[in-house]
Amino acid sequence: MLYKILEANNGLPSNAKVIFTNTGREMEQTLDFVQECSDRWNVNIVWLEYDELDNQITKSTSALFEPTLDYVIVKIPRWNFDKFEGSERTLGLQMKAVGEVMAIGRSFQEALHKATQSLEIKRNGLGADGKGYKDYNTIINKLKYASWDRVFVIYDAIKIGISLERIYEITKIDMWFLKQYEELSNIEDEIGKYNISIISTDLLLEAKQKGFADRQIAHMLNCLESEVYKKRKENNINRVYKLVDTCAAEFKALTPYYYSTFEQEITDKKGITYTQNESLSTNKKKIVVLGSGPNRIGQGIEFDYCCVHGVLAASECGYETIMINCNPETVSTDFDVADKLYFEPVFWEHIYDIIQHEKPEGVIVQLGGQTALKLAEKLDRHGVKIIGTTYKSLDLAEDRGSFSELLKKNNIPYPEFGVAETADQALKLADSLNFPILVRPSYVLGGQGMKIVINKEDLEAHVVDLLQKIPNNKLLLDHYLDGAIEAEADAICDGKKVQIIGIMEHIEPCGIHSGDSNATLPPFNLGDFVMQQIKDHTNKIALALNTVGLINIQFAIKNDIVYIIEANPRASRTVPFISKAYKQPYVNYATKIMLGKNKIDDFEFKPSLEGFAIKQPVFSFSKFPNVNKNL
């Protein structure tokens, strides 16, 4: 095979962290050392032999040692085309991804499945979820033109009978990869011949070793996910955790950096059956912090900042810290941040198995953005303690209708509103609300699905579209306060006392999403009367929601009256900005309050800021030339 060089670049490539993290290569350590020497002695060059550096994973070998891997890494980009209607979704020379996920498995097939489960695009893996393409022409077109979802389309093509030779002819993807897909398709077909009662242990184990999720197997067997979970537990088909050691167990690794897989049981000379689990659970008090998953619009690196500082605070409180995340771009997935790192999908099945293995005191969900919050309901239902604000309060704030009733009960101003679950209900509400109307679904990220409508035709079309995309959702319709000023406040609450850590005024008018708005800290144009209302409302809402930890509240101000837009009892994207502007470790304080270690009065809040701090978003519209660029 002939290889040709396309380009060569000095410096670190975008996938450098994936390579360094999983091979133990010390490029980052070398660069840090060079920079430190350069800064300290004002020199430009430091010559360092590679064998002078230690392998940071094994701690017992030098960096001058070729990595030996007994695991496979799969990286998949994360796109956000749904935010850009009309955008060109074909991939090409210009990068369009907004983030990425990484997965580790014993085989390519297992790692591929885990990576697709990490994407958070409402897929349970490759196939076996009823969401694949079935139209021949659509599939052929997506194979011809590199589509963002081609990793799924290849599987769909095999399922409808398109030959591997034809797929190779169109895509030029190596036949080895296509045969891996074909094997997965054959396993799905085989499992489909059985039901949950008669499927063999060997076939179920093989499916799990290939990375199929319990949900996918349930889809194949036409049963519940819980039945598959119960079946594999009865047959001792359990996850085991392996070290990412860079040396295939040739040397002892000291870094607690794990991935999951499934193994055949081993029987020793004494007849004892077991599986080799390299992650040994201790008797220490433990806390799990759920990460924020892949970067995308509405959920970026701000939440990773919160997760990292939360982990460090929990460690200061004497807990063994356990981080779960799948984003290779983050600091939280550095193998020396938490006491244990599980590089796993932030996906229910994986999370629950880790919790069953580690038996932590509880799980922190309010630092990982919407990704972690979406798991709160299942954690609560399965008896897992949520650290800080309870699931009941989290759900109350997320449910637009229930939250509006809470405001009404506490005499806090809010725009006229109504809750609709059908288009007919929405049209009836419109008669009493008056246009323009803001339509907002519950339980969404980054303003997804929110829209201002100005007539009944627009309202009906948008509600029908929303309920198709997000079935069984409660939609909040409220009268849009045209011309209002928008502001937001972040606060910490210990359940009895509230400390506001920052109030920001948006420069754009109300109606521009807070993540897209320029904002100033502190406000530059709000009078004392308005500021006092913001403080009073923040105190009332934080206490009414029984908040323990962080809370963010957004306001609309019109005619000197402060109305509530929404409240989120979790870390917001502005917390890192406020913490850095005021030079205060607010996430550290909030985490210690969540853990019950401290109260508000235990901390000295001394924000330090001369002048104003300005938050300004950065857009990438140049990547999407044909989309509407209006905010």
Model feature map: region roles:
Residues R166-I167, Q216-A218:
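Short alpha-helical "recognition helix" segments of helix-turn-helix
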Residues N55, H219-T255, N455, H462:
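Amphipathic alpha-helical
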Residues K428-L438:
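Acidic/histidine-enriched active-site and ligand-binding environments that engage anionic O-linkages
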Residues K230-K233, K242-I412, E421-K428:
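ATP-binding N-terminal substructure of ATP-dependent carboxylate-amine bond-forming enzymes
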Residues T21, L48-Y50, I324, T389, ...:
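Conserved beta-strand termini and adjacent loop/short-helix elements that scaffold enzyme active sites
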Residues N55-G211, E234-R239, S279-S281, K285, ...:
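ATP-dependent carboxylate activation and anion-phosphoryl transfer catalytic cores
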Residues M1-I57:
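ATP-dependent adenylation/nucleotidyltransferase module used to activate substrates
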